[in-house]
């Protein structure tokens, strides 16, 4: 029987979210862009509605922020997901690695940490590149409310 050393086990399987380095934490993000879609909240019920309206800093084709390191200078309301506030974002998709690992679940087979690229994620249509429109092209965000996506269940 072959022995497995701790270094053979991927960091996300041997460390808790709190034990991860900042670089490991950042690498958990699959880059789907779902966090970068604007959400609307009903003022009376606090229900969150998902839109296909992407932040103006999101490159929709690559699903990457144009200014990730300086994003708060460009978008002061951009979210910063941390170990401390992870559970404040109940709307995180069911496919989100942060959510999955916090719930004790494995990463999906298409995750870039497992496949080495984002191609499988895009192929599974997990990313927003197939549905997103840039906020600069939208007049009324309410016209862009999506039926609750399956990833929001």
From Swiss-Prot:
Coiled-coil segments:
none
Q: Which superkingdom does the taxonomy of this entry point to?
A: Bacteria
Q: Which Pfam families match?
A: CxxCxxCC (PF03692)
Could you tell me which InterPro entries the record lists for this protein?
Answer: Puta_zinc/iron-chelating_dom, UCP006173
- Species this protein is from: Salmonella arizonae (strain ATCC BAA-731 / CDC346-86 / RSK2980)
Describe the family membership recorded for this protein in Swiss-Prot or TrEMBL: Belongs to the UPF0260 family.
Tell me the gene name. Answer: ycgN
Give the PANTHER family listed for this entry: UPF0260 PROTEIN YCGN
Protein name per its UniProtKB record:
UPF0260 protein YcgN
